[in-house]
Amino acid sequence: VHGRFGQQVEVGDNAITINGQEIKWFCERDPANIPWGDLGVDLVCECTGVFTSRDKAALHIAGGAKKVIISAPGSNVDATVVYGINHSMLTQAHQVISNASCTTNCLAPLVKPLHEAMGIESGYMTTVHAYTNDQQLSDVYHSDVYRARSATQSMIPTKTGAAVAIGDVMPELAGKLDGLAVRVPTINVSLVDLTFNAGRETSIDEVNQVLKQAAEGDLSEVLSYCDDPLVSADYNHIPYSSNFDSLQTRVNGSLVKVMAWYDNEWGFSNRMLDNSIALLSAPE
C-alpha cells in the first residue's frame, strides 16, 4: 500500500534492528508480562485492537510503562484526544488515552471551524471506507453479518461510532451528529461525507473560505484544502487527518454538504505519533 520501507532492517532472535537501533520484540497474551519497565519504556501504543478498554490497556502500566495510547476508540479512558482539536487539554495526570478513530480524526477538523463560524445544529456523516482486516476476502462466518461478506466484491454498509465520538472531543456537539459507514473494495484511503444543518443560511463560498482559513491557520498540521479534481488514489500516503475537497461543497440555505478525504492508515499513524509527543510533554 505504501511501498517499500527504505531503511536497513535486520532480524535477530528477540529483536529487530532498524538503521542500527535495536527494538526488542515479545510474544505475550498478557501485556502485564511484557517488561516495559526494565526496558525504560515511557509510552506504549496499544495497536492490537484487543485491549481497548482502560482496564485492559492499563495492563501495560502494570508491566512498567508509564503511559498508553489506544489506536482505536476506547472505553472508560482518561481522555479521547484528536490531535489538533483538543490535545492541549492533556496533562501528566492522563495515563491511558484513546487516539479516537481515523474517521473521527478526519471529521473533527471539518466540524470545529464550521461550528465556530455558523453553528452545527444537527448532522449525519457517511464514511465511504476502504476495507480493513476485520472483513473477509470471501464470504465466510463473522459475528457481524455485513462483515461476513466479501470485502472485494461488494459495497458493505456497516456501523461506525465516529460521528457520535465527536461529542467526546467537542462536548458542545454531543448528541448533534450521527453516522454510518459503507465499506468499499479499495485497499486504502477513505472519504467523509458530512451533511449538516447550520445555525443560519450560508453559501458555498463561505463554507469553503472557512475551511481554507482553518487549513492555513490553526489546523494547518491536520487539515489540508484542495481545489483540484482528485480521486482517492491521489491521497495515498498523505499525512493530514483530513483533506477537504472544496469542489464537492453543496449548500441549500442552511443545509450544507462537505466532503474530505483521508488516508485511514498513514494519516492516523501520524496522529498516533503526534499525540504520543503531546502526552509525554504535557504539563503537570
Enumerate the language-model features and the residues they cover:
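C-terminal substrate-binding/catalytic lobe of Rossmann-fold NAD(P)-dependent oxidoreductases
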Residues: 1-35, 119-122, 127-256
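Acidic active-site catalytic centers that drive phospho-/nucleotidyl reactions
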Residues: 42, 46, 193, 263
